[in-house]
Amino acid sequence: DIRSGRRRVAVVGNAEASLTPELFEGFTNMGALGTDEGLCKLDGSSIPDWRRASRPFGENCGFTLAEGTQYVVLMDDALALELGADIHGAVPEVFINADGLKKSISAPGAGNYVSFAKAVAAAVAILGENTVKNHSFIHAHGSSTPANRATESEIFNRVATAFGIDDWPVTAVKAYVGHTIASASGDQLMSALGTFKYQLIPGIKTIDRVAADVCQTHTSFPLQDRDVRARGMDLALINSKGFGGNNATAVVISPRKVGEMLSRRHGAAMDDYRLRLEQTRQRAEDYEVRADRAELDVIYRFGEQVIDDSAIQLSRDGLTMPGFGNAVIFDKSNPWKDMS
């Protein structure tokens, strides 16, 4: 909608509160969840290590349910400059593809090859081969299941082979927060924006080693935080999968690279933008200070401007409400005249 001009701003996000008996039972019946028994068996222990329950791309036994929420504000480039918005990144493309026919509803399928390869091809077209080969990283779905670690890593490596990419860093935020279901890709996006800001790729710290069936021919899976300030990361590929066979891959560009692109399009207007950006950041800092002091200035209007039901005027043609200039006009057309 933003690219077509239908919208100038959009709030995008999700929230999920999945820690309920019904969801636990459903995912358990699918054999998708990690269990205390499974963790103990992996570790040769009688006590489960819950801090390391989610183990993407390591020896694992299922994912860990979690709850979360993530939201981002998207706007077109001209509006962002006009408002002096603090730009944390840009999303030029998102590709979605279903698996189609397959043997199991919960098994990984072929659709992710399409979404991921399309995303890499788009990134090359937008930013060039050098950025994709040397200054990009992958935020994997990394659900902490044996099937995911083998199949997703194979996708990454086969696409890397096709595009001539080596030593491609792969991380997985579910090692830190578990699987928040609807907002899981939002977790990945927020972590990617953090990498752009601090130039650190978070390590998959819940595993001691990468599992033997994980394909690592052209990829690397850091187990500790990786400092990439010298290399510089300007591109993240966020990969997401869903039970039922849907897949999505997003291209996310760093604010540094976005700044270069905006300068080429808007030229001298960037000087005015930078002045507005300073004001925006100062207001954000001031708000943070007030919030720390619980000075939230909450707008509370309970009981104000309540519509008086008795003042509603009704007729056969429509109705009017106090405080609204336009009436509600009834649609009297019959779309089923042939059946009436």
Predicted ranges, named:
Residues A10-N14, L74, P92, L237-S240:
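Short beta-strand segments
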Residues G318-S340:
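Extended non-globular C-terminal regions
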Residues G38-T131, S136-F137, I253-P322:
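Condensing-enzyme catalytic core mediating Claisen C-C bond formation in acyl metabolism
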Residues K197-G244, T249, V258, E304-Q313:
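Internal helix-turn-beta structural module
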Residues D1, V73-D76, F116-A119, F156, ...:
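Buried hydrophobic packing segments
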